[in-house]
């Protein structure tokens, strides 16, 4: 007995993933749980046995009934003991199921190979996990759309290269976040629509074992697979046309890549909000007793957005695992895919699930500081309005070249005062002292709404054309509140 084995065991005595303890929702954790996985295996064995019974193989109705009665009473300790002895997880659960249903023991897994169970179960679980992600992307899009509509016409300074640029609106900027999320949602929906079962194919995908069981009758082999798929709630024509021992591992690469695209969209949204928090323009929700720093009591850190970007970055970096695994599968299959998939697939979903819950929470409680937004606009608008000032002066008879030179000189001087002396932008004050600009309504030329183009109308069109159809498709789940534990 090792020293470690003598220690009392509780939930704090070993490693637990933060994805489980801090980030992922109960629903996503349940989807990737051992109970869900092995319960799905048993349902696959039941579907196989029932289909074999209906085709006249030596599987009795009583045996099928016994299997159905024991789908969920899984003795995990017994399964662990079998696996420690057999070193094979599928066979360990064959024996465990047989212990629970002893009269059916002899027909469990009849004609099957491990991947007839594992690949089909993984497909069912992946479909459900992708559905959760799709629903949560739709929820984030809905909340971003609501925010965009509320602030559709509120001017704010635009930024390119993180340098002041032409104004936009707070709502228009939010549509950019929602559009990225909508692109990600389309990716996820495409993955769901394209999913196929592996079907019943045997050890190398040739169906040789089933052909032998069914007396060489190919039509019965095809009927067996159709019946099996239907009993799992899957369209009979949605199995892979051909496969080796597993379904194509490029499918995992596609799924991980689609999750990475969603993660990149989340990362962009939350990074933008972190920058805006620094500018004191928009902040994520901050609770009454929340602490920003153990040392600096005044701090209001955007910790939710920071955590979401950290989780998103983790998901993006997992995507390479799927490509590596698909590329290195030899011939009909090698087992080096297994250990990697047990980590990369569930953890990508768990991390993205947590990031999406955070994003929905943030979008639902954003705090907009109008005064800060206006102050930053006021500091930059005189420069941006310089062309309109030039045109207005020329229209009143001023020499265009003289007016241009005056604006240039005063703009440079005002810019120097702002950058080098920390003074406010006094360009308008300087221009008011020039006879060239006498009588011009300079303040009127600084109406920020005159510089936002069609931003409000673009918001309206985007919400109507993109957000509203998503709301309609996901109306059953879009109002679900996110679980944010810390």
Task: Give each language-model segment a name.
Residues 307, 314-400, 406:
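Long, amphipathic alpha-helical stalk/connector segments used for oligomerization, subunit docking
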Residues 125, 172, 253-261, 388-396:
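Short, well-ordered beta-strand elements within core beta-sheets of diverse protein domains
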Residues 283, 406-413:
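Active/binding-pocket-proximal capping segment
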Residues 218-246:
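Active-site-adjacent "gating/activation" loops or surface patches in catalytic cores
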Residues 149-171, 283-299, 332-339, 364-384:
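Glycine-rich cofactor-pocket loops
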Residues 184, 235, 244-338, 342:
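Glycine-rich anion/phosphate-binding loop at the beta-strand->alpha-helix junction
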Residues 2-208, 214-229, 292-293, 303-307, ...:
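A helix-coil-helix interface module used to build multimeric assemblies
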């Amino acid at each position: 007995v090792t020293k470690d084995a003598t220690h009392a065991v509780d939930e704090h005595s070993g490693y637990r993933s933060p994805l489980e303890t801090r980030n992922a929702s109960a629903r996503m954790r349940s989807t990737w749980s051992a109970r869900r996985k092995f319960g799905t295996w048993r349902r696959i064995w039941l579907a196989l046995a029932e289909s074999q019974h209906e085709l006249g193989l030596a599987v009795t109705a009583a045996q099928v009934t016994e299997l159905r009665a024991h789908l969920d009473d899984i003795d995990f300790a017994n399964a662990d003991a079998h696996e420690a002895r057999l070193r094979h997880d599928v066979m360990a659960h064959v024996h465990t199921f047989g212990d629970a249903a002893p009269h059916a023991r002899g027909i469990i897994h009849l004609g099957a190979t491990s991947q007839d169970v594992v690949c089909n179960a993984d497909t069912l679980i992946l479909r459900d996990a992708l559905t959760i992600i799709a629903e949560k992307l739709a929820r984030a899009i809905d909340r971003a759309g609501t925010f965009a509509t509320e602030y559709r016409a509120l001017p704010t300074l635009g930024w390119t290269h993180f340098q002041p640029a032409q104004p936009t609106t707070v709502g228009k900027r939010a549509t950019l976040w929602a559009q990225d999320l909508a692109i990600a949602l389309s990716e996820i929906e495409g993955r769901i629509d394209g999913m196929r079962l592996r079907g019943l194919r045997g050890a190398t995908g040739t169906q040789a074992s089933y052909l032998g069981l069914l007396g060489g009758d190919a039509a019965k082999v095809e009927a067996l697979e159709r019946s099996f798929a239907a009993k799992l709630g899957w369209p009979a024509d949605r199995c892979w046309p051909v496969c080796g021992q597993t379904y194509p591992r490029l499918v995992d690469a596609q799924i991980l890549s689609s999750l990475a695209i969603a993660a990149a969209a989340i990362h962009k949204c939350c990074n933008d909000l972190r920058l805006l928090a620094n500018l004191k323009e928009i902040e994520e929700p901050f609770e009454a007793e929340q602490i920003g720093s153990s040392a600096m009591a005044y701090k209001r850190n955007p910790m939710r957005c920071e955590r979401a970007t950290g989780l998103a970055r983790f998901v993006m970096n997992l995507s390479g695992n799927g490509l590596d695994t698909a590329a290195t599968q030899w011939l009909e299959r090698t087992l080096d895919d297994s250990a990697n998939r047990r980590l990369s697939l569930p953890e990508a979903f768990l991390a993205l699930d947590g990031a999406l819950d955070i994003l929905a929470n943030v979008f639902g409680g954003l705090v907009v500081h109008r005064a800060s937004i206006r102050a930053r606009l006021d500091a930059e608008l005189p420069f941006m309005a310089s062309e309109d000032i030039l045109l207005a002066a020329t229209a009143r008879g001023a020499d265009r070249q003289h007016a241009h030179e005056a604006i240039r000189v005063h703009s440079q001087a005002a810019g120097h005062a702002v950058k080098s002396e920390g003074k406010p932008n006094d360009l308008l004050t300087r221009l008011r002292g020039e006879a060239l600009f006498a009588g011009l309504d300079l303040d009127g030329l600084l109406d920020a709404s005159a510089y936002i183009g069609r931003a409000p109308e673009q918001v309206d069109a985007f919400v109507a054309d993109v957000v509203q159809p998503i709301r309609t498709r996901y109306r059953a789940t879009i109002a679900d509140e996110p679980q944010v534990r810390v």
